[in-house]
Amino acid sequence: MSKIKDILSIELENDIKNVIDLNSQNEEDIKEELDGFILTESLAKHLSDFLDVFCSDMKESGVWLSGFYGSGKSYFAKMIGFLIANPVIKGTSMRDRFMPKLIGLKNKEILENQIRSLDKTDYQVTLFDCAKVDSSYGLSYMAMSHFLLSLGFLSNWIGMMEFNLMLENKYDKFLATVKEQNAGKDWHDIRKKMSAVSALKKAILTFMAEDEYEETRKLIDEKIKTYDATKLKDDLMLYLELYPEKKIVFFIDEVSEALSQKKINLLDLEGLSEALSSLGNRVWTVQLFFERKVRISKK
């Protein structure tokens, strides 16, 4: 006689996470969370509705995702985020790993076509929980600092320096110079240590005068302290000019909690939404709120 565990597609022995953290994005966590995710008919309908709007040509590019405490909105949003980003996990793309979850659904073919339509565009996806991250410089810098992380940079002034080098098409030269100056050590290993600042400066001084470096460092520090939605929009525009085939997507979790903690305010949200909406559908924001029932709607 078959046992229940023999007919289920999930492993009953696996631990179930009480909380899904959008800030946790290592490969093992993503695989574990995807393996445990169950796409019900209701969630499949929400996913289809979202993708229908997201893949359209509409200019509005903001989405609310709301639900009661424990409804799984963070879990759902994280799965959508990684479907869009489509990272390779243990040798297999996220979208390919997700497809078996469609088996048995009423709208399987429609949903599969919608997911495959994501292949037409290259997305840069940023996910973060705004109630758990440093809010010293406001919501806009929260978004920018995590955008830097999504690019593989640091989230501080060094990351902004890396970003500027990328915009000037000097980042590859910088990486090669660091390796040459540090006995073959990679910058991504060096920057984890206290010696990162000196290694950064030494490499940059090979193609920039010292006074120019110091002035750039000063300007970046001031920029971060006064970072706002307009600066975020300008930085994202520069990135999109460099990569015209890309679209940017922000998933911002626990907005209600961050508001209640006074880490952000409604003016922050309004400013961010207005600034990014001026970029059309090249920059999307998906904001997660606490409410009594789950719904997805256009902002």
Where are these regions (language model features)?
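Flexible beta-alpha connector loops of hexameric P-loop NTPases
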Residues: A131-S135, I220-T226, S256-N265
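Long, low-complexity, polar/charged, intrinsically disordered or flexibly structured peripheral segments
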Residues: A183-L232
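P-loop NTPase motor core
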Residues: L34-F37, V63-F68, Y75-S195
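Walker A/P-loop-proximal flanking segment of P-loop NTPase domains
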Residues: M1-S71, A77-K78, F82-I84, D96, ...
